[in-house]
Amino acid sequence: YRRDAEAFLAALEDEAYRHFSGLKPVCDFTVIYERSPDLFTASSVAELDRLYAEARGDEKRRLAYLLAFAVDGYMGAETRQLGDEVANTENRTTITVDGEEIGLRAAPVAMANEPDRARRQRIEEARLAATAEHLNPLLGAQWRRCHELARGLGRKDYLDLYSEVRGIDYMALRAKAETFLHDTAALYERTIDRLARERLGLS
C-alpha cells in the first residue's frame, strides 16, 4: 500500500506542477486516480477509521497519519472530475479590462504590477465577477459533494470529519484567530500607515 501510495502522490504532484506552471494546458487528475482504483475506497477508509478508533498510543498516532492520507485521497478520488473542471475552467477563463484580455490566473500578477489604483480596482472587480460566474458554481458543487462524503463516513459534515482526522479543533482555532486579529487591528493599521508613508511615499 505504501509503495502504491508513494507512486500515486508522485504522479499527482507532477500533474499539478505541470499544469499550474503552464507546461500542460489541460489538467487531468482523473486519469491518475483511475490508475489506482483500489487505493482510496469508502470501505478502506471505513476500515482504517475502525482501526484508528480502537488503537492507542503510538499505533493511534501512526494510524492518524494514514487515515488522514486515505480521507484526502478518497475525497479527491470522488471529486476528481470536478477538480479537473475547476482547474481547466480557471486556466481558460479570461477577463477584459480596458480592452486588454488577461487570463484569470494572471490577474493577481497584473494587479501587483499595475501602478494605477483605478485600473487595479477594475482588474479586481473583473476577476471577482469571472470567479463568481465561472468557478464558484463548480467549487460549490465540489464542496457539497465533500460534505456528502463526510456524512457517508459517519460524520456530521466535512468540518467534523477533518477536525477528527487532523486532530485540530477548527472552531477553537477560528476563535483564537479572530481574537488575535481584533487585538492587533490598531497596531496593524498604524504599522501599515507608517510603512506606506516611509517606503511607498503614500499619504
Could you describe each region identified by the protein language model?
Residues 1-133, 140, 159, 179:
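N-terminal helix-rich structural modules
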Residues 83, 90, 129-203:
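Contiguous, non-catalytic segments that form substrate-binding/exosite surfaces or channel walls
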